[in-house]
């Protein structure tokens, strides 16, 4: 949890926003997935948002569903994902690592056991995509017991009550949704979300990172100009993996070429 605090403090000092890529662990296989993550960090990623492949990804658009299927095809299991997380943490001791996942996976381990495992491998935050704030008590209590930040999604139509709850229960960062619907780079992010950002700040929420439909540097800049602390990009990155699936080296070069200008756009 503290890794987010120190990251946001450092970025503030440098007058920068955060650029956070999302990928699915184990896509397209364990070895290449670890290389992908190293490449994202080398290219300027400030934090990581990682998916654990699971059979029923509700909020995911087709691009990220395909990533899940590729990881399954490679035989990747949740247990192996935790081994990968431990390796990533060893190699990159300071970068904040967040998981974005679904409740079934948490339940299949047992809620407390799941967060205990997160703490053990050095995961900083968990966003359970299909658990709304009002049903989140057992998840967020277990998370806090194990020093893991519970992350909540703030939808574009959030009312005042919801904003207060998100501010009160969330830690680490707030996932600010560009728009409703499923993830995907082809659905460009609709801005501005200034009024939500203003309210979240007023209620002392964790810093907002804008996600969903972020696929170009101008959108990263627009999110930060609207008051977000940074931006999360998933489908656009996963699409690059898909496009270069048979050329692992070219894939890494293309990922680097995508991330560098996205990170550059966070510098005012």
From Swiss-Prot:
Pathway the protein acts in: Amino-acid biosynthesis; L-tryptophan biosynthesis; L-tryptophan from chorismate: step 5/5
Active site, UniProt feature: 49 (proton acceptor), 60 (proton acceptor)
A GO-annotated cellular component: cytosol
Oligomer and partners: Tetramer of two alpha and two beta chains.
Record flagged with keyword Lyase: yes
Keywords from the named record: Amino-acid biosynthesis, Aromatic amino acid biosynthesis, Lyase, Tryptophan biosynthesis
Biological role: The alpha subunit is responsible for the aldol cleavage of indoleglycerol phosphate to indole and glyceraldehyde 3-phosphate.
Family named by the database record: Belongs to the TrpA family.
Keyword Amino-acid biosynthesis among UniProt keywords: yes
Protein name: Tryptophan synthase alpha chain
EC number: 4.2.1.20
Provenance organism: Escherichia coli O17:K52:H18 (strain UMN026 / ExPEC)
Catalysed reactions listed for this entry: (1S,2R)-1-C-(indol-3-yl)glycerol 3-phosphate + L-serine = D-glyceraldehyde 3-phosphate + L-tryptophan + H2O
């Amino acid at each position: 949890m503290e890794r987010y605090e120190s990251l946001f403090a450092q970025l503030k000092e440098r007058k920068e926003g955060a650029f956070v890529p999302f990928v699915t662990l184990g896509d397209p296989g364990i070895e290449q997935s670890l290389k992908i993550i190293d490449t994202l960090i080398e290219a300027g990623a400030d934090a990581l948002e990682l998916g654990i492949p699971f059979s029923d990804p509700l909020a995911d658009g087709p691009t990220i569903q395909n990533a899940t299927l590729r990881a399954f095809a490679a035989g990747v299991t949740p247990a192996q994902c935790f081994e990968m997380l431990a390796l990533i943490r060893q190699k990159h001791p300071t970068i904040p690592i967040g998981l974005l996942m679904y409740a079934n996976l948490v339940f299949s381990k047992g809620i407390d056991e799941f967060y205990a495992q997160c703490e053990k491998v050095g995961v900083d935050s968990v966003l359970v995509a299909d658990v709304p704030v009002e049903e989140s008590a057992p998840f967020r209590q277990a998370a806090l017991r194990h020093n893991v930040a519970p992350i909540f999604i703030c939808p574009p139509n959030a009312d005042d009550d919801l904003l207060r709850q998100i501010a009160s229960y969330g830690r680490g960062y707030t996932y600010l949704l560009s728009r409703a619907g499923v993830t995907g780079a082809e659905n460009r992010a609709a801005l501005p979300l200034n009024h939500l950002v203003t309210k979240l700040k007023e209620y002392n929420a964790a810093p907002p990172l804008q996600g969903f439909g972020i696929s170009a540097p101008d959108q990263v800049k627009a999110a930060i100009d609207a008051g977000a602390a940074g931006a999360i990009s998933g489908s656009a990155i996963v699409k690059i993996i898909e496009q270069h699936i048979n050329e692992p080296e070219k894939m890494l070069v293309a990922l680097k070429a995508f991330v560098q200008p996205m990170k550059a756009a966070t510098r005012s």
